[in-house]
A protein has these predicted regions:
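N-terminal beta-alpha lobe that positions the nucleotide/phosphoryl donor
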Residues: 1-167, 175-176
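ATP-dependent carboxylate/acyl-activation modules
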Residues: 148-149, 153-157, 161, 173-200
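Conserved short secondary-structure elements within globular domains
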Residues: 170
Length: 200
């Protein structure tokens, strides 16, 4: 896991253009790499469990009632599966290194989201950062929501997806700010009570 500043040194092709743009504006944040999410899935055998769960679904003729039940079970499976202790400690250290445990203030808000997407999960964090980790898992679980799975079935004929980066940013979910976007020469900018938090 890397701070935005560290991640930007690796280049947009490795960490995404939004992270590089945020780092250039000195936005504090952290990138949870796709490898971390992938390791979580594999460590608790989620690909096989999810494959068995969705086996009854025919992508050419989706029973939406059955799919709705299965997606609720899949979301619960992600939320209730545990990360390995080493992974948890790595996350906590990285969160602290990024200044997102707010140890100097006794706590603070963060939101987690995917690059380029406004929808997020929020948490009130105190050291070591358990609430932030739970928000990350809720975001990962949202990939298995009914609408998200239905879109994947329509577009790809399957329910699977690749791991993607997750961003952890200070404050609550941002909102579009056209004035900030214009000042930065961007089409869109998101801000919250801490300042700039998104340049998709």
């Amino acid at each position: 896991m890397l701070t935005f500043e560290e991640a930007a040194r690796r280049g947009a092709d490795r960490v995404g253009a939004e992270v590089v743009r945020l780092a250039a504006q000195d936005v504090r944040g952290m990138v949870v790499p796709p490898e971390f999410e992938d390791a979580f899935y594999r460590s608790v055998n989620l690909p096989e469990q999810l494959g068995r769960l969705f086996a009854p679904i025919n992508p050419r003729r989706v029973d939406e009632d059955a799919l709705e039940d299965l997606t609720a079970r899949a979301e619960a499976l992600i939320r209730t599966s545990f990360l390995m202790d080493d992974a948890v400690q790595i996350f906590y250290r990285a969160l602290g290194n990024a200044g997102l445990t707010f140890a100097d203030r006794g706590g603070g808000a963060v939101h987690v989201r995917r690059p380029g997407h406004l929808s997020s999960e929020e948490a009130q964090v105190t050291p070591p950062g358990m609430a932030a980790l739970q928000a990350v898992k809720r975001l990962w679980a949202s990939d298995w929501a009914f609408g998200a799975v239905l879109v994947r079935l329509d577009e790809t004929g399957g329910v699977g997806l690749d791991a993607r980066p997750t961003l952890v940013l200070p404050g609550l979910t941002g909102t579009p700010d056209p004035v900030m976007a214009e000042a930065l020469g961007m089409g869109t900018a998101w801000v919250n009570e801490t300042g700039l938090v998104g340049l998709p």
